[in-house]
Amino acid sequence: MTTTNTRHVTLFHAPQSRSGGVLALLEELGADYELHVLDLRHGEQRKDVYLAVNPMGKVPAIVHEGALVTEQGALYTYLADLYPETGLAPAIGDRLRGPYLRWLFFYGSSFEPALVNR
């Protein structure tokens, strides 16, 4: 009998990009994942085969049970929620969930750009 891991995800990754954090998180979670590496220098993110997966042509992106999830903060939240037993994110309904989300999105919208754009 074959069993399926309903938490299996496919990560579309490009080295030296924001997808490195998602790859590190998958490892930290001990997640079951398949890795597809894109070469941004050769424009693989703009080829039809990848645009069929992610019409925005950006990385990182994951596919989980047929659903596409993109954007770094959304990916971190989604994956932490997919593996609640790791305790990496407060559960929905936990009083710390709001502050957790605030700092997570502050990082992606304010802190990281300040570091990258200086």
Where are these regions (language model features)?
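GST-like domain detector, emphasizing the conserved glutathione-binding G-site
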Residues: 2-118
